[in-house]
């Protein structure tokens, strides 16, 4: 090794120290993953070189054959991994190997579960895979030179994973990165060709780059040649280019883990080659769990884009709509040019056609999963259901298809589990029912006990219970499904159509007429709180209820707007009374107008609480209630 110059010792960023401590002391149950992570990084380095060399072929320095070499030295107890990819400059080394993006680290540490096997796989997802080397090594040396820089600008990084690292400038004639792991005592098993070969086959067979090991000679062949002979130990072909019939499920699963930096198997995948007007291959995966940043709409997302097997970019987000941002995979196009950029992707009509086809492909895959593997679909819904609910607003063309994939809780069950498909609901509709009834609210316990459901329980009509914050917004984009319109049971004047008999309707009219005097008194007292007072057709057990005006915002939408700092339009609820309830009868008979007013306000506030709303003046409610209790106990 050449003379080192400009040598300096630097301290690790605090988060890196935490991470190293974790790697060394916690993630030792699945040690072999260090090799998977380092190979994955080397593969990325080769992808980056290929991409940059499209615009600047000199970067290849005459060596366009990219590969990864893994070797070992039993006597020195070392494992060496070398690639001829893009390499790193001194600045890159200090940045990438001494610090981690704070957001990534914080999220990494937050996501640790204490389960060693799961935690060991999290490291790739958060871009900290390099540090897994310290699981098996007590010292790591990195020698690197960035493609395009002179040989004199190589860099040597070295650390024992304790609190600091050394960095020095060296001569390095060949571009790329060489990592030497000085194995800890007790980790000698990895300085072995057979062991390394098995780990590579297990985790990295799908890597499209040849991964080479030195050929081993045994018995009569034991005379080793002066120069090692290298042999490729992985398939080294892009998995998506192979015919589906030739790819085993296990290979698809391992490739997913590489692409998604995930440790769990995917729930489903779809591998397709499209020929004709457009030519491209796609391999799309539905993950088995939600990533930590699923609800950050600005978080990186998208597919890996290749053009004619050449890697172009990670996170190409133009191929799928935002509501499918959880889908992972690759798309390899023959129609795009090799110098394609993000700006071009946004304008190219070819992309629109591909996006439309890939979106349909994903929705078909989800339909198939729901139909053939309902338990797996339950897992999918638990992880990604709320994101899929963004679909009807974003993708009008596929609204009906997306609606068929949605799942809801309903009054038909007791668990609150979101397992009811709209098609199932329609299949159970009562004779004469032509609408899909639903109720939105803050929580399952609140909506299942809502007074709004009383008449539906009495008539045995199923009601969907929607408690996700996005639900009211979703329903504003979903007016109907399969020809049946949706009706919010808490909104407007409830009309059950033919589910109410003519006798029912006649009786309702007569009762409303008999209570006209009471309605007028209530209107006067509640003029500032209620937009309207009327007799209710919804109630069988409760004295009163609040309904939402046909054009007014519901509670969920008001809360979303308030939380985002937007102005919420002023609106008053409709106050409905149950004329047969003893409290309403007593109220009607109350001659003292002051006491009538106090009791009316108590009933109004109780109805607001039952609807999940907060009181504008809780103190006044408590004062009135206490006064009433004193009167009753006198």
UniProtKB/Swiss-Prot annotation:
Q: Quick one: where's region B?
A: 343-559
Q: Could you give one GO CC term from the UniProt record?
A: cytoplasm
Query: Where are the annotated segments for A?
Result: 1-342
Q: Which UniProt keywords apply?
A: ATP-binding, Chaperone, Cytoplasm, Nucleotide-binding, Stress response
PROSITE patterns found in the cross-reference section: HSP90 (PS00298)
Tell me the CDD domains matching this sequence. HATPase_Hsp90-like
| Protein's UniProt keywords contain Magnesium | no
| Any single Pfam family the record assigns to this protein | HSP90
* Subunit relationships: Homodimer.
Protein name as catalogued: Chaperone protein HtpG
Gene source species: Pseudomonas paraeruginosa (strain DSM 24068 / PA7) (Pseudomonas aeruginosa (strain PA7))
Gene, per the UniProt record = htpG
């Amino acid at each position: 090794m050449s003379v080192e110059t400009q040598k300096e010792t630097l301290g690790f960023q605090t988060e890196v120290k935490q991470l190293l401590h974790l790697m060394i002391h916690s993630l030792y149950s699945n040690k072999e993953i260090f090799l998977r992570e380092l190979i994955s990084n080397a593969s990325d380095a080769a992808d980056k070189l290929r991409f940059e060399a499209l615009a600047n072929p000199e970067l290849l320095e005459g060596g366009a054959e990219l590969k990864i070499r893994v070797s070992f030295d039993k006597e020195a107890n070392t494992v060496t991994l070398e690639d001829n990819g893009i390499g790193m400059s001194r600045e890159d080394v200090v940045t990438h190997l001494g610090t981690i993006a704070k957001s990534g680290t914080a999220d990494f540490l937050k996501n640790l579960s204490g389960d060693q096997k799961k935690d060991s796989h999290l490291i790739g997802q958060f871009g900290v895979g390099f540090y897994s080397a310290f699981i098996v090594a007590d010292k790591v040396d990195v020698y690197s030179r960035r493609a395009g820089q002179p040989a004199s600008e190589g860099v040597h990084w070295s650390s024992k994973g304790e609190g600091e690292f050394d960095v020095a400038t060296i001569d390095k004639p060949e571009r790329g990165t060489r990592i030497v792991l000085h194995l800890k005592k007790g980790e000698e098993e990895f300085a072995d060709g057979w062991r390394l070969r098995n780990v590579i086959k297990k985790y990295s067979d799908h890597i499209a780059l040849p991964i080479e090991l030195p050929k081993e000679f045994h018995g009569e062949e034991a005379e080793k040649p002066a120069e090692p002979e290298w042999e490729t130990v992985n398939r080294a072909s892009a998995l998506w280019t192979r015919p589906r019939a030739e790819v085993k499920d296990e290979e698809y699963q391992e490739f997913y883990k590489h692409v998604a930096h995930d440790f769990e198997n995917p729930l489903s995948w779809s591998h397709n080659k499209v020929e004709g007007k457009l030519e491209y291959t796609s391999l799309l995966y539905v993950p088995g769990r939600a990533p930590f940043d699923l609800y950050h709409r600005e978080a990186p997302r998208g597919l890996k884009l290749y053009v004619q097997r050449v890697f172009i970019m990670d996170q190409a987000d133009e191929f799928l709509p935002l509501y499918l941002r959880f889908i992972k995979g690759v798309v390899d196009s023959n129609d795009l040019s090799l110098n394609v950029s993000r700006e071009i992707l946004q304008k190219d009509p070819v992309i629109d056609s591909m996006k439309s086809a890939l979106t349909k492909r994903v929705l078909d895959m989800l339909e198939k999963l729901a139909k053939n593997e309902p338990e797996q679909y339950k897992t999918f819904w638990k992880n990604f259901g709320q994101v899929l609910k963004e679909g009807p607003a974003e993708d009008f063309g596929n609204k009906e298809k997306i609606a068929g994939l949605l799942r809801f809780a309903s009054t038909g069950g007791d668990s609150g589990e979101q397992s009811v498909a709209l098609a199932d609901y329609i299949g159970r509709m009562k004779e004469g029912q032509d609408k899909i009834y639903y109720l939105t609210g803050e929580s399952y316990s609140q909506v299942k006990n809502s007074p709004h459901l009383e008449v539906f329980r009495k008539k045995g009509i199923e009601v969907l219970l929607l408690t996700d914050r996005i639900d009211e917004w979703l329903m504003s984009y979903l007016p109907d499904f399969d020809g049946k319109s949706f009706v919010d049971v808490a909104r407007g004047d409830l009309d059950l159509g033919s589910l109410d008999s003519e006798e029912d309707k006649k009786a309702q009219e007569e009762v409303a007429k008999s209570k006209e005097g009471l309605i007028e008194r209530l209107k006067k007292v509640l003029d500032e709180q209620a937009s309207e007072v009327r007799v209710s057709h919804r109630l069988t057990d409760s004295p009163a209820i609040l309904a939402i005006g046909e054009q007014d915002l519901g509670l969920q939408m008001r809360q979303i707007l308030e939380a985002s700092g937007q102005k919420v339009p002023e609106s008053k609820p409709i106050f409905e009374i149950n004329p047969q309830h003893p409290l309403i009868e007593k109220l009607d008979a109350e001659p003292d107008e002051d006491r009538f007013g106090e009791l009316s306000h108590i009933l109004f506030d109780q109805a607001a609480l039952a609807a999940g709303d907060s009181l504008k003046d809780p103190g006044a409610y408590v004062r009135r209630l206490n006064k009433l209790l004193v009167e009753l106990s006198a």
